Amino acid sequence: MQTIIRVEKLAKTFNQHQALHAVDLNIHHSEMVALLGPSGSGKSTLLRHLSGLITGDKSAGSHIELLGRTVQREGRLARDIRKSRANTGYIFQQFNLVNRLSVLENVLIGALGSTPFWRTCFSWFTGEQKQRALQALTRVGMVHFAHQRVSTLSGGQQQRVAIARALMQQAKVILADEPIASLDPESARIVMDTLRDINQNDGITVVVTLHQVDYALRYCERIVALRQGHVFYDGSSQLFDNERFDHLYRSINRIEENAKAA
């Protein structure tokens, strides 16, 4: 099975607090993987390293590779990092859209990497690009909002626009950081349904950080759980049972309660 993301000996320290401890991880083509863990476990930190949004510690042997290209090595970004990022779609909890632009214009931003620079200066997109953007919006059920300002949309609708932008980008990997954290249950279901549809029908690798264990079990075949910066569990979601859940979450809660009591 083709390895899409490879992480070796990744460590990260913030202000003398070690957030990640020598993490090793391989993610394969067409997988949909949930990163789970309590707050502060390192799951979002790990996700942001995968495309070089942040760099790890300068640890000997640390290395991240995406789609066969080095993203970072021993705390330094690769010189051709833009090529890796061009193949990666991002979906963040805070949506990361341009509020003053229309839905269609936000989706067209996904084509900037494949558009001549002089065209991007004037937002001159081809008819073919606009058609692809509309097709992407149709795919996520948002084409009727194409000419509406993105600032008028609900949180769930904005997340679907972000997914359409990743489709427009023709991303081979989608990294989603808490995409349903602030959404109501129905909007969360629609967003996760959309991500799973893209994963299953397009073969796009999806890595998503989640707080909601039930969504991870329902939508992702594989779970990677982090606990205090270490990989606690890496395997089938079907084998992530109540005992593992208890060790992952409740033991952390007991540690925090004991610390407060002290």
UniProtKB/Swiss-Prot annotation:
Entry-linked InterPro entries: AAA+_ATPase, ABC_transporter-like_ATP-bd, ABC_transporter-like_CS, ABC_transpr_PhnC, MetN_ABC_transporter-like, P-loop_NTPase
Membrane-related topology note: Peripheral membrane protein
Residues annotated for ATP binding in this entry: G37, P38, S39, G40, S41, G42, K43, S44
Keywords in alphabetical order: ATP-binding, Cell inner membrane, Cell membrane, Membrane, Nucleotide-binding, Phosphonate transport, Translocase, Transport
Domain of life: Bacteria
Location(s) in or outside the cell: Cell inner membrane
Disulfide bonds: none
Location of the ABC transporter domain: 5-253
Keyword Ribonucleoprotein among UniProt keywords: no
Catalysed reactions, semicolon-separated: phosphonate(out) + ATP + H2O = phosphonate(in) + ADP + phosphate + H(+)
CDD domains: ABC_PhnC_transporter (cd03256)
SUPFAM superfamilies cross-referenced by the UniProt entry: P-loop containing nucleoside triphosphate hydrolases (SSF52540)
Record function comment: Part of the ABC transporter complex PhnCDE involved in phosphonates import. Responsible for energy coupling to the transport system.
Subunit structure: The complex is composed of two ATP-binding proteins (PhnC), two transmembrane proteins (PhnE) and a solute-binding protein (PhnD).
Protein name (record): Phosphonates import ATP-binding protein PhnC
Taxonomic source organism: Shigella flexneri
